[in-house]
């Protein structure tokens, strides 16, 4: 049973509240808390000069600022602390604050707890954004007032008073957001699981544990959607508290969705033929099947079919940019893990020129090398992980006694220039980094946009 938002309003009024992080996603939260009568202090590692005009904007509405390298040293004396998702709650500063009586939470935890609308939550290692968007589009097509947020869209907590019980909310949730959750969405999905974010999580087991929070607090009338083709997620059926639907690309599924004789079906009913889908790759068929399971109770087959046959993809996800001198360029900047890059490679019918590399999340690249060596014509590497990826591929190339040209570059501009010089008519060049962007770019969108800008200047 969800709590009425008036309880939160009564709770937060006049409280001393710390908001850690003054990033774009936290700014609406800060302003909303001020509007609700909280005494807000915003904390950030950046100095005033780097924050720019937002520092003055916040001070004008009565927000105190704590800035600079040692900003977390001043967390004492607050009633409530909203932490940014990527910060571990076992940091000494948070532990000390909690021991002193502070309530530590996050925007997403409070949103799910008080949101009056039905909440669809999507997590997993790969396919989250596409599946979130598919669910959103299907619900919208059916006529529901639908909101989308979490890792995509806009921060939703500040809009919670506009939401009603007959509205729908679709959230993409990361392991960081889920780590401290003690509340779960009514309809939850885990797309798949493979090692990821091991630069933040202690190990893969903790990463999986965090993902499970998406269904751990469900009730008996809630729904969990699981990938039958993924051993880890398939076994989670035993831990489910409510109903379970599964999806599969390789097995017949009667209680869920599957691909059968090239037809996408849900609960035995045909939705569409795979040849009529705009999205490239079998991984996107899996994303569609997962979405069908999530919306099955709320959306007609006609609405599912419309979205499945008309949706052409999300920006930065195997996105076709242009063809230059017979060479096709694709932007798959969202691919921040080896498994996501491998899925992208599998969507092409011939080996490609791959541009990869970036920030090191401490995850292995051997699975990418072993599964992708025969799908890559030339490998162009950049970023912090370039030598790590090179080493993984060289081992496989040596073991398989095959050949592959590997080129090391120092920038995106150089990567595209090298690819353009090497490519022959009929080739495909794709940016699919298998890594996060933080060594060179603030996020994958900026990385993808730079790649597109360079390609469009060719």
Curated annotation (Swiss-Prot):
Subcellular location: Cytoplasm
InterPro entries: Mur-like_cat_sf, Mur_ligase_C, Mur_ligase_C_dom_sf, Mur_ligase_cen, MurD
Reactions it catalyzes: UDP-N-acetyl-alpha-D-muramoyl-L-alanine + D-glutamate + ATP = UDP-N-acetyl-alpha-D-muramoyl-L-alanyl-D-glutamate + ADP + phosphate + H(+)
Gene Ontology cellular component list: cytoplasm
A Pfam family recorded for this sequence: MurD-like_N
EC class of the enzyme, as a word: ligase
Pathway: Cell wall biogenesis; peptidoglycan biosynthesis
Keyword Ion transport: no
HAMAP family the UniProt entry points to: MurD
Principal location: cytoplasm
EC number of the protein: 6.3.2.9
Protein's organism: Clostridium botulinum (strain Langeland / NCTC 10281 / Type F)
Binding, ATP: 124-130
GO MF annotation list: ATP binding; UDP-N-acetylmuramoylalanine-D-glutamate ligase activity
Chain's role: Cell wall formation. Catalyzes the addition of glutamate to the nucleotide precursor UDP-N-acetylmuramoyl-L-alanine (UMA).
NCBIfam families: murD
Protein family according to the UniProt entry: Belongs to the MurCDEF family.
Protein name per its UniProtKB record: UDP-N-acetylmuramoylalanine--D-glutamate ligase
Key words, A-Z: ATP-binding, Cell cycle, Cell division, Cell shape, Cell wall biogenesis/degradation, Cytoplasm, Ligase, Nucleotide-binding, Peptidoglycan synthesis
Listed GO biological process terms: cell division; cell wall organization; peptidoglycan biosynthetic process; regulation of cell shape
């Amino acid at each position: 049973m969800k709590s009425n938002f008036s309880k939160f309003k009564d709770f937060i009024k006049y409280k001393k509240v710390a908001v850690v992080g003054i990033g774009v996603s936290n700014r609406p939260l800060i302003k909303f808390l001020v509007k609700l009568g909280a005494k807000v202090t915003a904390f950030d590692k950046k100095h005033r000069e780097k924050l720019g005009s937002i520092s003055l904007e916040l001070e004008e509405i009565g927000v105190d600022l704590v800035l600079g390298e040692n900003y977390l040293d001043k967390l004492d004396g607050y009633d409530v602390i909203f932490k940014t998702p990527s910060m571990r709650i076992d940091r000494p500063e948070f532990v000390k604050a909690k021991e002193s009586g502070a309530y530590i939470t996050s925007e997403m935890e409070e949103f799910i707890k008080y949101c009056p609308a039905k909440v669809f939550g999507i997590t997993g290692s790969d396919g989250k954004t596409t599946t979130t968007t598919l669910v959103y589009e299907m619900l919208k097509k059916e006529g529901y007032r639908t909101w989308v947020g979490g890792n995509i869209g806009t921060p939703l907590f500040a809009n919670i008073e506009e939401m009603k019980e007959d509205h729908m909310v679709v959230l993409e949730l990361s392991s960081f957001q889920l780590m401290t959750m003690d509340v779960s969405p009514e309809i939850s999905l885990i797309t798949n699981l493979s090692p990821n974010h091991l630069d933040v999580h202690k190990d893969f087991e903790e990463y999986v544990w965090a993902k499970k929070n998406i269904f751990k607090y469900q009730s008996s009338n809630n729904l969990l959607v699981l990938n039958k083709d993924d051993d880890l997620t398939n076994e989670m059926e035993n831990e489910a508290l409510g109903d379970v639907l599964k999806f599969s690309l390789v097995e017949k599924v009667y209680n869920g969705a599957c691909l059968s004789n090239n037809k996408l079906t849900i609960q035995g009913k045909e939705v569409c033929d795979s040849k009529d889908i705009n999205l490239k790759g079998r991984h996107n068929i899996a994303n569609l099947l997962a979405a069908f399971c999530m919306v099955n109770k709320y959306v007609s087959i006609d609405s599912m079919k419309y979205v499945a046959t008309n949706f052409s993809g999300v920006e930065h996800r195997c996105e076709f940019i242009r063809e230059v001198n017979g060479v096709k360029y694709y932007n798959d900047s969202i691919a921040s893990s080896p498994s996501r890059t491998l899925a992208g490679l599998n969507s092409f019918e011939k080996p490609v020129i791959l541009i990869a590399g970036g920030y090191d999340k401490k995850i292995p690249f051997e699975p990418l090398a072993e599964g992708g060596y025969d799908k890559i014509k030339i490998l162009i590497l950049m970023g912090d992980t370039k030598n790590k990826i090179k080493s993984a591929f060289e081992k496989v190339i040596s073991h398989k006694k095959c050949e592959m040209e590997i080129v090391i570059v120092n920038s995106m501009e150089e990567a595209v220039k090298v690819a353009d010089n090497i490519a022959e008519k009929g080739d495909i060049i794709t940016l699919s980094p298998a890594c996060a962007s933080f060594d060179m770019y603030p996020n994958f969108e900026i990385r993808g946009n730079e790649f597109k800008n360079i390609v469009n200047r060719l």
